[in-house]
Swiss-Prot record:
EC number: 4.3.2.1
GO molecular function: argininosuccinate lyase activity
Location relative to the cell: Cytoplasm
Pfam families in the record: ASL_C2 (PF14698), Lyase_1 (PF00206)
Gene responsible for this protein: argH
Keywords: Amino-acid biosynthesis, Arginine biosynthesis, Cytoplasm, Lyase
Protein name listed in UniProt: Argininosuccinate lyase
One cellular-component annotation, GO: cytosol
Coiled coil start-end: none
Entry-linked SUPFAM superfamilies: L-aspartase-like (SSF48557)
Length: 459
């Protein structure tokens, strides 16, 4: 059995089951490059402050770089008996340079070491998420440009409400994802902080230079309080919260893609590249990727809830419970980056059935609001107009016709304010084109939304 680095005050060793229960190396392996980066900064600082000699600092750094090379070449075997990523890396360093490796941990604890690794890891993930979000937003804008004059039903309660521009519908998701982008950008602020040097919780008696390691690691600033530094997991919770909101938005979009691609809607068709078949039904084309994004949303929610539950009762400063902060973060990072990539692919290859979309608006009463507005512009109080149109819709339903099928004589019996121009008003395309209020679905309004988005994206 490997001798534990903390084993001096113990008379008995951990039994195998307990050792396995406490070990975290099975899921911490992805932190290895960040752990080595943190150690390289730490040992340089130790040398420059004279805590260890310049020669010792140089030899340890050379050893760390050899371990780093082995890691890149896939020559590192992570061992459970070394507990965690830090002890595994230090074990390999010891193989390279011998007992001198023990000086690396001067003025450092695994408490500040592990959270430094996590700040570095999450900072890199946030860069990837922001880039993937930018690409997806660009794809949505490009799709919207070609769908400004595509007419479709707008829905409330999943019932036809008013005709809208499909471009407008797409730009609503652009706005959601832009808010997601802004939240992740703000997440960077709280992630771009250096906890290294906080040691176990109280700082250290050694004359360390935390500003130097902050600079070497590329952090914006150092934590102001050593206890906060080792116990803070807000930056991860922010990430998981932002990830949950993002997945909720993607899930809503996927739900609509699933509806629109169904036989009953036939509004869009997903590429074969993002669909699968059935093992028994030869005709099936299943939108599995959209369903998977919708399904994976739950696991991201779960990761947020799990860490919130871990954190809610922890006294300052470090607790072993913190070992449970990583797997959910890793899983959510993988999930959202993959989901963004798949979503981008689905939208980039989406086929839009413009004819079916517009035809659907001609077989409903989504133009009823246009008729009520028409009467209101003629001087009739809107509430009265609403009542009259409602009665007319009921009569049309009984007769099996739509508002555009009502003859002018019947219209004028409803209200003498109605003239022949009402038929133009009732057209879906006219209805959409007239709604050019700020943020509205009118063609000119949607064009303005797209132009603003292009400026934001610099495309």
């Amino acid at each position: 059995m490997v001798e534990k680095l903390w084993g001096g005050r113990f008379e008995a060793s951990l039994d195998k089951q307990t050792e396995e229960f406490g070990a975290s190396i099975k899921f911490e392996q992805r932190l290895a490059p960040f752990d080595l980066k943190g150690s390289l900064a730490h040992v340089k600082m130790l040398g420059e402050t004279g805590i260890i000699t310049t020669e010792e600092s140089k030899k340890i750094a050379e050893g760390l770089k050899k371990v780093e090379e082995k890691l890149l070449n896939g020559q590192i075997e992570f061992k459970m008996e070394n507990e965690d990523i830090h002890m595994n890396m230090e074990s390999y360093l010891h193989q390279e340079i011998g007992p001198l490796a023990g000086k690396l941990h001067t003025a450092r604890s695994r408490n500040d070491q592990v959270v430094t690794d996590m700040h570095l890891y999450l900072k890199s993930i946030l860069e990837a998420v922001l880039e993937a979000l930018k690409v997806l937003r660009e794809t949505i804008v490009k799709l919207a440009v070609n769908q400004i004059d595509t007419i479709m039903p707008g829905y409330t309660h999943l019932q036809h409400a008013q005709p809208i521009s499909f471009g407008q519908h797409l730009m609503a998701y652009y706005q959601m994802l832009t808010r997601d982008f802004e939240r992740f950008e703000f997440n960077v602020k709280h992630t771009d902080m250096n906890p290294l040097g906080a040691a176990a919780l109280a700082g250290t008696t050694f004359p360390i230079d935390r500003m130097l390691t902050t600079k070497l690691l590329g952090f914006e600033k150092a934590y102001d309080n050593s206890m906060d530094a080792v116990s803070d997991r807000d930056f991860i919770l922010e990430f998981l919260s932002n990830a949950s909101l993002l997945m909720m938005h993607l899930s809503r979009f996927c739900e609509e893609l699933l509806l629109w691609s169904s036989h009953e809607f036939k509004f869009v068709s997903l590429s074969d590249t993002y669909s699968t078949g059935s093992s028994i039904m030869p005709q099936k084309k299943n939108p599995d990727m959209a369903e998977l994004i919708r399904g994976k949303t739950g696991r991201v929610y779960g990761n947020l809830t799990a860490l919130l539950t871990v954190m809610k009762g922890l006294p300052l400063a470090y607790n072993k419970d913190f070992q449970e902060d990583k797997e959910g973060m890793f899983d959510s990072a993988d999930t959202i980056i993959t989901s963004l990539t798949v979503m981008n692919g689905m939208l980039s290859t989406l086929t839009v059935n413009r004819v079916n979309m517009e035809k659907s608006t001609e077989q409903d009463f989504s133009n009823a609001t246009e008729l009520a507005d028409y009467l209101a512009t003629k001087g009739l109080p809107f509430r009265k107009a609403h009542e009259l149109v409602g009665l007319l819709v009921l009569d049309c339903i009984k007769k099996g016709i739509y508002l555009q099928d009502v003859n002018l004589q019947d219209y004028q019996m409803l209200s003498p304010l109605i003239n022949e121009d009402v038929y133009e008003v009732l057209k879906s395309r006219t209805a959409v084109s007239r709604r050019n209020s700020l943020g509205g679905t009118g063609f000119e309004s949607v064009k303005k939304q797209i132009e603003e988005a292009k400026k934001e994206l610099q495309i």
